Curated annotation (Swiss-Prot):
Keywords: Chlorophyll biosynthesis, Cytoplasm, Heme biosynthesis, Manganese, Metal-binding, Oxidoreductase, Porphyrin biosynthesis. Disruption phenotype: Cells lacking this gene fail to grow under aerobic conditions, with accumulation of coproporphyrin-III. A divalent metal cation binds at residues 113, 123, 157, 187. Pfam families: Coprogen_oxidas. The record marks 187 as: Important for dimerization. This is Oxygen-dependent coproporphyrinogen-III oxidase. It comes from Synechocystis sp. (strain ATCC 27184 / PCC 6803 / Kazusa). Substrate binds at residues 109, 125-127, 296-298.
Amino acid sequence: MTVSPTTQPQTNHSLPPADAKQRVSQFMQTLQDEICQGLEALDGKGKFQEDSWQREEGGGGRSRVLADGDFLEQGGVNFSEVWGKSLPPSILKQRPEAEGHEFYATGTSMVLHPKNPYIPTVHLNYRYFEAGPVWWFGGGADLTPYYPFAEDAAHFHHTLKNACDQTHGEFYPVFKRWCDEYFYLKHRQEMRGIGGIFFDYQDGNAPLYRGPDPNGPAAQYSNQLAPIEPLGWEDLFSFAQRCGRAFLPAYSPIVEKRRNTEYGDRQRQFQLYRRGRYVEFNLVYDRGTIFGLQTNGRTESILMSLPPLVRWQYCYSPEAGSPEAELTEKFLVPQDWVNS
């Protein structure tokens, strides 16, 4: 049995600056603004409607939704900034040293559900936490196609890898494997999509992988790495900013390439069926959904990630050799998209 290395205590050089919360909060709001502006320009028709909200226990946020656009059937981009007396059990299980401390959390999240089945759904989330003596960054971005286009997957992964490599060359290999592990529907034994990057509890110390599976590919890869020089708070903040700003270059060219592809009822019905997997994941496994519900977050904002239309079909099986069959049989399996 492989045992994950214990995390190192945070040292003075890596402690957050006095204005850390203010700076990260400002960036998360700016990221929301930049993404919304970019998506409105890309869509060409729809406009985001903003809904500001306050949380009784402390904090609040801005929810923005674009519905019935040109390529977007529905998309939401959220900013939130909350604080309180105690982190929920789902996080304390991973960071028990935060127990008994007040917490602060801020982040931006996004889910886009396009109309055209040939344009993939996409998800993004970047977040920052402080709780007493501990702090960390988390987040990632992932792509969920309905029809298999290897060049789209390669472009998305290349763009995220370039953002990761500017901080450390081992970030992408670990966080890509972690993403494959995280966005997996155990009850279906299926990947949700073709992944991207996912990371959590990053405070600049080893190991890079901080997930629940000590024997999985992400943990095995992370554990065999040579010792990595500890990174400071500023390094990780810059990393989060680069990843956040890599989204539009990663996704926009895919939209432009696929938005005018003709489709019929067969493709639309398959898209709605596969959206069911998205709903299942978000309601059963998604860490952000669980955190929001456990901290009395705003339900409308938490469930903003769900598609406007979806369907389930009992014991559905795609036609052998069809693009629909290829999606799950060959495409939605962990693979090296960068070098494929």
